[in-house]
Amino acid sequence: SAYDRGGGGGAGGFRELKSPSTPYTASPLDGYSTPGNRITVTATGFPIAVGGGGAADNSPPYTVGANGSVSTFSTISSAGGGGGGRGCVGSNGGSGGASGSTGTGCTARAGGSGNTPPTTPPQGNNAGTTRDHPAYAQGGGGGATAVGGNATAGVGGPGGAGATTSINGSATTLAGGGGGGTDGDSANKGTGGPGGGGCGASGPYPGSSVAA
């Protein structure tokens, strides 16, 4: 089917602030030194919202998955990941969602933009580009520390890599982008980015998803 070619979804925005007095190894995206990022924690309540992944859209043609929802701690927000496109351009988000392709005669499309809205350090990266007729394949979604991979002939692009932090006591990689889908051979679907990105799908079958 022309509508089974979905781009990888982008990871949700990754933001980390580590005080120099805190004894753990932060990711390269530690924003503590950036003016305006710090929050003084006191013995009071803070608004907290834990975002989730966006839902797929299974109604062709030319559809795009929903973006993830925003996560918030006090005044600091991380954008939801951009939804992957299926026959259309992927969405912008914390990390961008990749575009999808459709029928014969289409041209390759760039993916959605990451770091949307912009933060310092960047909360995410752009998605990869599609590969259209005759060897359809889709780009990978952006990850926290790397862009999504571009599709090549019949091979889905890998999801962008996430960020590694030891905030929970051991090195953990978070916010990887989703792999791009393909037509045909399941061995050629895009791999999910390190940090939880789901693999792409081949043919009419659904890709994998992971918890936000």
Language-model regions, residue ranges each:
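Low-complexity, glycine/proline-biased repetitive segments and flexible coils/loops
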Residues: 1-212
